[in-house]
């Protein structure tokens, strides 16, 4: 395994952080493979070859999903945000902004950034 996914010396990192880094790398690799199959399928004229490629892509979807679930289980904050963004109706960016506000400031967030008012303003 290479060390290019690390920004800190790997031998100084605890085991769970190295595992997390490996799983992030695996997630990226699965996403790349999904994209590669999508490109191949877009050009493949032979139906039998396309069916085989589609089956392989489905396996990559499964691998990606397992990697993501592992990471979400190990990172509660990420999971909490993801649960409020994934598979929700409405504009994605809007849902993400609301999710961040809810997770950071609680469900009763007032929409502010929590920085405070100008000097002399009433609280």
List the predicted regions and their residue ranges.
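Iron-associated oxidoreductase/ferritin-like identity signal
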Residues: 1-123
